[in-house]
């Protein structure tokens, strides 16, 4: 019995060491070049993160945009994950559009630049 417990603890320790934490890489862009007053799609692509504990929000002036679509969580080589969230929107001059990403205990907002 003691050998089984020791082996189980070894396995948990091994998995913990192998599962390195990786911060997400975030890209915020639109489907078409940004033009105020023209319908578009705001996209936030988050990749290269581990563990998969993550929340993505699309914002207009700090308020959550409704009717967003999110892909299923997918993984890459090296136990890293990626996820994309999008929403149809019509950009208005003077308003700020952003993607807020919470990964583990870190939260950051990334702005959409219409000239990208």
Swiss-Prot record:
UniProt record, GO biological process: antigen processing and presentation of peptide antigen via MHC class I
Residue ranges of domain Ig-like C1-type in the record: 24-111
Top-level taxonomic group: Eukaryota
Localization per record: Secreted
InterPro entries named among the record's database cross-references: Ig-like_dom, Ig-like_dom_sf, Ig-like_fold, Ig/MHC_CS, Ig_C1-set, MHC/Immunoglobulin
Family: Belongs to the beta-2-microglobulin family.
Known role: Component of the class I major histocompatibility complex (MHC). Involved in the presentation of peptide antigens to the immune system.
Subunit structure: Heterodimer of an alpha chain and a beta chain. Beta-2-microglobulin is the beta-chain of major histocompatibility complex class I molecules.
The protein's name in its UniProt record: Beta-2-microglobulin
Protein source organism: Labeobarbus intermedius
């Amino acid at each position: 019995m003691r050998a089984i417990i020791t082996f189980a603890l070894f396995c948990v320790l091994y998995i913990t060491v192998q599962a390195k934490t990786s911060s997400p890489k975030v890209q915020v862009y639109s489907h078409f070049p940004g033009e105020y007053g023209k319908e578009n799609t705001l996209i936030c692509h988050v990749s290269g993160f581990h563990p998969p504990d993550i929340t993505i929000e699309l914002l207009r002036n700090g308020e959550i945009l409704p009717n967003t679509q999110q892909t299923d969580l997918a993984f890459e080589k090296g136990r890293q994950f990626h996820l994309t969230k999008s929403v149809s929107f019509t950009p208005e001059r003077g308003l700020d559009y952003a993607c807020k990403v919470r990964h583990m205990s870190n939260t950051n907002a990334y702005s959409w630049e219409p000239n990208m």
